[in-house]
């Protein structure tokens, strides 16, 4: 069996997605997500100019050897562009292999470890009242876990909170927009938000919060301590992820569970965090960390230290990644939770899929492969549109972490 064709499909049904399609000489094909939010074209070039020419003629069943070839053979290892491109190849090959076996991907991975997959969604509001209403709507849809983000008084725009659309999309401008940030206003207000949410909805719903890398370690420790009475499921991305020892200091000061990893692209990015048990959940994504092959290694390593998975699952990842992640979630023993932001009807039409949602939980479906396809004719109707992520400045003008 040989790979005879591979192509990159770029489409924008409401936001940009990059998809790799690999075709074999038996007519079986697989697809993988290659979307890197705000840097999509860089992955397209990496695939088309460097990886696809080498991929043609290889046996698609040799997934591990192909992965090692592109990782070790690149010399310039790791990095978001290269690992996203490698992930697209890896997921497409797993899709092919499962189709060859005529079984859903989770069966090929080892079979299911649970009957359904717990997910969380986002509840965002420009103020406290609208945030409480967003939580109520999410709860009414059946979600048992909800990430809560709220506008901060005195800050014009806050991460996670939409200002002009129903669905929050941070990559919203042709060139990076500038947002203003105040750490002190944020730290003074957010504990009150969670106090109000707990008072309104009680102790039984799981609550999560994303800091989005905005704090120093001691500031994050302060926030984690202040949130302890409200028993969060996790506090996410509390500090910039480059210095893993930052989490050691946070851990020393608070029992609020910690999650990190959506910007990671290698097991080496999270090795110290996991083995020192400085985090509780690893959020590394299949699409940005080299695919299923490396995520298996990360999850297996994490299981040795009681760290569970909590994959990133916002709409900056296509339904292709969501489908692959759900099959992984179904199988992985140390599963924690799966993020879910609903794709639009437009997006779902371009990417028909077998996975389903019911009462706060997902199942990946029984279709062979990862169960997600792409309608190429429909995808062609939505051309690429450049969209950049914002940048942050403090109130005095200092550039800050977005």
Curated annotation (Swiss-Prot):
Keywords: Lyase, Magnesium, Metal-binding
Listed GO biological process terms: amino acid catabolic process; carbohydrate catabolic process
Alphabetized Pfam families for the sequence: MR_MLE_C, MR_MLE_N
GO molecular-function term, one example from the UniProt record: mannonate dehydratase activity
Record-annotated active site: 159, 212
Matches recorded under Gene3D superfamilies: Enolase-like C-terminal domain, Enolase-like, N-terminal domain
Entry note: cofactor: Binds 1 Mg(2+) ion per subunit.
Enzyme Commission number(s) of this protein: 4.2.1.-, 4.2.1.8
Residues holding substrate: 37, 122, 262, 283, 312, 316, 339
Keyword field contains Lyase: yes
InterPro entries in the cross-refs: D-mannonate_dehydratase-like, D-mannonate_dehydratase_GalD, DgoD-like, Enolase-like_C_sf, Enolase-like_N, Enolase_C-like, Mandel_Rmase/mucon_lact_enz_CS, Mandelate_racemase_C
Binding-site residues for Mg(2+), renumbered to this chain: 210, 236, 262
Lyase is among the record's keywords: yes
Reactions accelerated catalytically: D-mannonate = 2-dehydro-3-deoxy-D-gluconate + H2O
Requisite cofactors: Mg(2+)
Similarity comment: family membership: Belongs to the mandelate racemase/muconate lactonizing enzyme family. GalD subfamily.
Function, as annotated: Has low D-mannonate dehydratase activity (in vitro), suggesting that this is not a physiological substrate and that it has no significant role in D-mannonate degradation in vivo. Has no detectable activity with a panel of 70 other acid sugars (in vitro).
Protein name: D-galactonate dehydratase family member RspA
Organism this protein belongs to: Cellvibrio japonicus (strain Ueda107) (Pseudomonas fluorescens subsp. cellulosa)
């Amino acid at each position: 069996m040989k790979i005879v064709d591979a192509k990159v499909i770029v489409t924008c049904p409401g936001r940009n997605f990059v998809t790799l399609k690999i075709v074999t000489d038996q007519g079986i094909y697989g697809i993988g997500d290659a979307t890197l939010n705000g840097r999509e074209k860089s992955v397209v070039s990496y695939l088309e100019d460097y990886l696809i020419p080498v991929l043609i003629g290889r046996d698609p069943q040799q997934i591990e050897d192909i992965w090692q070839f592109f990782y070790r053979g690149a010399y310039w290892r790791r990095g978001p562009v290269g690992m996203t491109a490698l992930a697209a190849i890896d997921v497409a090959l797993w899709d092919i292999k499962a189709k060859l076996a005529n079984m859903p991907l989770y069966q090929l991975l080892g079979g299911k470890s649970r009957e359904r997959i717990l997910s969380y969604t986002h509840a965002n509001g420009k103020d406290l009242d609208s945030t409480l209403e967003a939580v109520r709507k999410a709860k009414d849809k059946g979600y048992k876990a909800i990430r809560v983000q709220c506008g901060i008084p005195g800050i014009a725009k806050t991460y996670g909170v939409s200002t002009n659309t129903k669905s929050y999309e941070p990559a919203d401008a042709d060139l990076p927009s500038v947002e203003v940030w105040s750490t002190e206003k944020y730290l003074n207000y957010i504990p009150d938000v969670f106090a109000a949410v707990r008072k309104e909805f009680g102790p039984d719903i799981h609550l999560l919060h994303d800091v989005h890398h905005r704090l120093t370690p001691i500031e994050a420790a302060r926030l984690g301590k202040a949130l302890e009475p409200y028993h969060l499921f996790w506090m996410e991305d509390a500090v910039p992820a480059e210095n893993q020892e930052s989490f050691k200091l946070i851990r020393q000061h608070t029992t609020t569970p910690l999650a990190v990893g959506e910007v990671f692209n290698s097991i080496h990015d999270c090795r110290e965090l996991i083995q020192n048990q400085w985090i509780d959940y690893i959020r590394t994504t299949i699409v940005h960390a080299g695919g299923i092959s490396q995520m298996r290694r990360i999850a297996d390593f994490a299981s040795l230290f009681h760290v569970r998975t909590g994959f990133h699952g916002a709409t900056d990842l296509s339904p292709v990644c969501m489908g692959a992640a759900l099959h992984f979630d179904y199988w992985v023993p140390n599963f924690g939770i799966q993020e879910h932001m609903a794709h639009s009807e437009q997006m779902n039409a371009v990417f028909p899929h077998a996975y389903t949602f019911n009462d706060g939980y997902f199942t990946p479906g029984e279709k062979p492969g990862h169960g997600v396809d792409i309608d190429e004719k429909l995808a062609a109707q939505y051309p690429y549109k450049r969209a950049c992520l914002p940048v942050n400045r403090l109130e005095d003008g200092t550039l800050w972490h977005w």
